[in-house]
């Protein structure tokens, strides 16, 4: 495995409860392409916590930094920009179609790299949204690599998820008497087996925006910095 280090003149240092926090950014060759990881820690001897973002394509470093950085007092936190996402989005990454199997292979390779780098036998994985699907799949395939798997926003059935989202935004629009929104949702039709019968991509994106608008993604949804970040993906 080839490792390329992203050189920074000095470690980024922040103070959380008077604890010095160090940050290392690395480019690691995974699955034949360079992929970026951000490692935050106070003590490299702490257990590893690998965080899997959602999407695919929604790296969550700003949210981890804002809400979860204190975990670095107890863990070596690793944020991975998955292929075609964030700092891992390159010309090379676009040459190979994304598949769940490819992402699982990338994850396995990254886990093995981290365990070797820090001389560990196991680590923790926390997955969110799409990352929760990927993390749970990894846990079922390779349990010996893990102490625990933690799922947040854990998906179980994408088919059920789509219909629940549609019903939520439709009911919210009806409560607000948003007739144009109601008619547009009706024109798309309720998803069947996870697929909208009319203009699936347009419908899925529209429903996603409405969920955010109606408070279904982030709580509280009046947080300016979080909303500004999240709006980039909607």
Each predicted region: which residue ranges?
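Conserved HGGG/HGGXW glycine-rich cap/lid loop of the alpha/beta-hydrolase fold
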Residues: 38-87
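A catalytic-pocket lid/entrance helix-loop region that shapes and gates access to the active site
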Residues: 148-192
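Alpha/beta-hydrolase
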Residues: 176-234
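Membrane-interface motif at the C-terminal end of an N-terminal transmembrane signal
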Residues: 1-16, 20
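Conserved acidic catalytic loop of the alpha/beta-hydrolase fold
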Residues: 102-122
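Cap/lid segment of the alpha/beta-hydrolase catalytic domain
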Residues: 84-101
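Conserved hydrolase catalytic core segment
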Residues: 120-163
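N-terminal cap/lid segment of alpha/beta-hydrolase-fold proteins
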Residues: 14-41
């Amino acid at each position: 495995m080839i490792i390329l280090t992203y050189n920074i003149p000095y470690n980024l240092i922040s103070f959380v409860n008077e604890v010095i926090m160090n940050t290392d950014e690395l480019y690691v060759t995974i699955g034949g392409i360079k992929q970026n990881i951000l490692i935050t820690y106070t003590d490299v001897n702490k257990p590893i916590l690998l965080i899997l973002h959602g999407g695919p394509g929604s790296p969550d470093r700003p949210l981890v930094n804002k809400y979860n950085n204190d975990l670095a007092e107890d863990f070596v936190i690793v944020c991975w920009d998955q292929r075609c996402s964030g700092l891992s989005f390159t010309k090379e990454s676009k040459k190979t179609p994304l598949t769940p199997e490819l992402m699982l292979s990338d994850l396995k390779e990254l886990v093995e790299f981290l365990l070797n780098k820090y001389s560990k036998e196991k680590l923790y994985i926390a997955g969110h949204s799409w990352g929760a699907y990927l993390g749970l799949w990894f846990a079922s395939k390779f349990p010996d690599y893990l102490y625990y798997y933690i799922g947040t926003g854990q998906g179980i059935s994408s088919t059920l998820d789509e219909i629940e989202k549609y019903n939520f935004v439709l009911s919210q629009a009806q409560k607000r008497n948003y007739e144009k929104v109601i008619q547009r949702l009706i024109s798309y039709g309720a998803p069947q087996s996870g697929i909208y019968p009319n203009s699936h991509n347009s419908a899925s994106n529209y429903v996603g925006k409405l969920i955010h608008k109606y408070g279904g993604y982030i709580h509280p949804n009046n947080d300016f910095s979080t909303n500004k970040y999240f709006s980039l993906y909607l």
